[in-house]
């Protein structure tokens, strides 16, 4: 629903939306009808092994090389991870998606992390490694600022907290719903990667203002954070 509402707000037309079982491993029967449609974009809202398998099937069916009304047919993966890209192999070439962070960023914080991680492990860090690194620093900083390890004090220190220096520019932990907002990286599978860690390239940075939504947005409203439980 989020993909449909966002794209239709920009003037796109949704030809079809198909749900697939989580346990599916062969997506051929779902991909084949796309060939007969007038669609010029396929959004594969899959993750992990499902994304690897569905993208592989889509490329095998020739969708990556298809032309629709003299335009290149595009396949989009909403969120990439290194393991997903590595699992799909050459099938990610030319495929657009997004990611939270990438080791090629040139801000000082990213470069320092890439250098220290690479020195210890011998290869550049993944998005997952970066997330773990940042969350550890944020927790330690919140405890220090709150002067306590009490979960309620830590939560209070993080609510509405804005920080910088971790890549992708300034980041906000919104107090109302504890969601994290920052610039989003649009990436594409590299045509000629130099290694298994060089599969994606940044093609655009979408400003945070374009991806921020209101806490009472219909797709996310209705929940409650409740009251803090200090764990006692």
Residue map of PLM features:
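Extracytosolic ligand-binding ectodomains
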Residues: 1-232
